[in-house]
């Protein structure tokens, strides 16, 4: 098989392996957690997902599409993502009380403040994962995704079994991001240079802007219904909706994601 075909196979394994792990973990955790736990995490994940869209900002796709991206390009995006993610986290941190008030669920205040840390962690992975995909090293991407998910699931099940409730789901999201980052660093071993170029940022943004708009609108449409349900109904109803919607869309989204890569 050619390199492109092999890469496609590994991208397929990455997405469906992750989907399979998610399915199995949901079956196990459904016996350990309550619907309102899933509802609470679903309410705040809406804001995390949309914020993550802005962190990537289409720069990952722009770097992949660019014929010969330089060290300056990669370093510029790396530093920009860090600063921007910190800014987003600060905004979310101070908006957390208002979001909790919007949903009439005080617990969300602390949940969002803690979970928001994944924005900063994820920002450190953008360039690393982009470089691996640029080199068609989808096997390494698959390892990073599946292994990080597996480790996080094991810890989450342990925490849920010991009565951590919704916090086990928060820790799961953080651990997935941490393990993914560590594995990307292990497989890629790229270190940014001490350089930042506004010219490179502008050039990449001109292409990435359209990808950003597309991703933002897609995520907004996918999550707006959950936002309304979370506001109008209880966290239990939100939890049931979140889990059913996840089961309904996960496989189709995985197929689309493989093709996009």
Predicted segments — roles?
Residues 3-19, 44, 54-97, 110-116, ...:
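Membrane-water interface segments that mark the loop-to-transmembrane alpha-helix transition
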Residues 4, 139, 182-227, 236-237:
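Interhelical loop/hinge segments that connect adjacent transmembrane helices in multipass membrane
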Residues 23, 27, 31, 53-57, ...:
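Membrane-embedded alpha-helical segments of multi-pass transporters/permeases
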Residues 24-50, 109-110, 203-207, 211, ...:
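Interfacial/gating helices of multi-pass transporter permease domains
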Residues 32-35, 71, 102-105, 135, ...:
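Helix-loop interface residues and adjacent transmembrane-helix termini in multi-pass membrane transporters
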Residues 53-71, 132-134, 244, 248-261:
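Helix-loop junctions and terminal segments of transmembrane helices
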Residues 60, 127-134, 138, 158-162, ...:
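C-terminal transmembrane helix end/exit motif
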Residues 109-116, 144-189, 206-207, 214, ...:
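Hydrophobic alpha-helical transmembrane segments
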